[in-house]
Curated annotation (Swiss-Prot):
Organism the protein comes from: Helicobacter pylori (strain P12)
SUPFAM superfamilies membership: ACT-like (SSF55021), Ribbon-helix-helix (SSF47598)
Membership in a protein family: Belongs to the transcriptional regulatory CopG/NikR family.
One Pfam short name: NikR_C
UniProt-recorded name of the protein: Putative nickel-responsive regulator
GO molecular function, one term: DNA-binding transcription factor activity
Role according to the record: Transcriptional regulator.
Length: 148
């Protein structure tokens, strides 16, 4: 199988599935509004590629991108400053933050990060472990290239 095809054309290939797996695939297509099986399969492959890219343990690979979503009690004493200190002290590049007031007690902050997977995940654990943090979820992405 030639995996280094430089042509941007779409390649057709077939996949053999058990009927119950195909039924589940078709249900997901309908549920999520995909226009075809191919669209869903492409998304699943992209997700797996990102997951595998994050699993590669290369401390010099700074191509990882992630969004950390944090919900916290803004009345918690010095929490905001501790979150900022952790961001400044980490080996991760903080590219952007967005802060919104959810209600009179809770804030939501998104932090866009770039760096190696270890440093990004460590930052998530440090912030997530702070007293007053109610939710800290990391959405992983990668800047590796694939053709559409």
């Amino acid at each position: 199988m030639d995996t280094h095809n430089k042509d941007d054309s779409i390649i057709r290939f077939s996949v053999s599935l058990q009927q119950n797996l195909l039924d589940e695939l078709d249900n997901r297509i309908i549920k999520n509004g995909y226009s075809s099986r191919s669209e869903l399969v492409r998304d699943l492959i992209r997700e797996k590629l990102v997951e595998d890219n994050w699993a590669e343990d290369n401390p010099n690979d700074e191509s990882k991108i992630a969004v950390l979503v944090v919900i916290y009690d803004h009345h918690q004493r010095e929490l905001n400053q501790r979150m900022i200190d952790i961001q400044h002290a980490s080996g991760t590049h903080v590219l952007c933050t967005t802060h919104i007031h959810m209600d009179e007690h809770n804030c939501l902050e998104t932090i866009i990060l770039q760096g190696n997977s270890f440093e990004i995940q460590r930052l998530q654990l440090e912030i997530g472990g702070l007293r007053g943090v109610k939710f800290a979820k990391l959405t992983k992405a990668s800047s590796f290239e694939y053709n559409e």
